[in-house]
Amino acid sequence: MAEVVHGPVADPGAVLALVAEAQAADGIGPLSEQFRLGVAGPGPHVVAEGGYAGIVIPPAGGPGAVEAVVAPSHRGRGLGRELVATALDVAGAGATVWAHGDLTPARAVAARLGLTPVRTLLNLRRPLADLDPAPSAPDGVTVRTYAGPADDTALLAVNNAAFAWHPEQGGWGPEQIAERTGADWFDPAGLFLAIGSGSGSDEADGRLLGFHWTKVADPATGLGEVYVVAVAPEGQGRGLGRLLTSVGLHYLADRKLDTVELYVEGDNAAALHTYTKLGFSEHERHVAYAHS
């Protein structure tokens, strides 16, 4: 029977082992990074023998989000439906549940609970061989790498302005930066900042206009990631997104990685156009479901 836990789960390692078991069976991870990090957090969580559901409720309020996993040995018994239904009740009105890979069993659970798709997130990939040369920076802009915590305030400002609409990427605070710069995968040499170096009113010397945060997602398989690309409103329309993305791709290629991935909203036509021109194509599809 599913149990709601308000506080840390008893054995986070066992939950992560369950996640790894499901990923090996399905070929795709059942929990996103945010939810994997949250396994060791204060919750709320929904736990059961052979299953787990994480719940994220935004600090500023608004609809929560749910992700769930069921061990291969416990499937076909209604456990997934029980976990998701319980977690959605805790998450509150308007909450969504993510189906990573949008696999058939997840779609079946959604249908039984009367949920319909409300959002699609695409995983795009491309090989890191045969990259086009990185474009030159426009006049009045230089690109450098992360210099440490002194850059954090500007990073947060640009991130939150660029992603004010985004339910996960927007609304970051110092804790989100610290959590990621403290992660094992973080490399300051892979965080690229576009800095205004002109004298115009919209690009005073030293102003951060955009950044590209890269990630070595899986060194064992040679997979890198375009983790975050953000351009400040005053930097848009100048090709900075393409410039920063290209610089980061060359950095990942120099790390001897084979492939790079990124995530983009399925309805973000402008970003999809840019990434398609950069040689990316769809690899995975992730769908959020909610009550109509």
UniProtKB/Swiss-Prot annotation:
Gene Ontology terms for molecular function: mycothiol synthase activity; protein-N-terminal-alanine acetyltransferase activity
Residues of the N-acetyltransferase domain: 2-138, 141-292
UniProt entry tagged with the keyword Transferase: yes
Catalytic activity field: 1D-myo-inositol 2-(L-cysteinylamino)-2-deoxy-alpha-D-glucopyranoside + acetyl-CoA = mycothiol + CoA + H(+)
Binding site residues for acetyl-CoA 2: 229-231, 236-242, 268-273
The protein's enzyme class: transferase
Entry keyword annotation includes Translocase: no
EC number: 2.3.1.189
Residues that coordinate or bind 1D-myo-inositol 2-(L-cysteinylamino)-2-deoxy-alpha-D-glucopyranoside: 33, 168, 215, 225, 263
Biological process according to GO: mycothiol biosynthetic process
Family under the similarity heading: Belongs to the acetyltransferase family. MshD subfamily.
Subunit structure: Monomer.
Its job: Catalyzes the transfer of acetyl from acetyl-CoA to desacetylmycothiol (Cys-GlcN-Ins) to form mycothiol.
Protein name: Mycothiol acetyltransferase
Gene, per the UniProt record: mshD
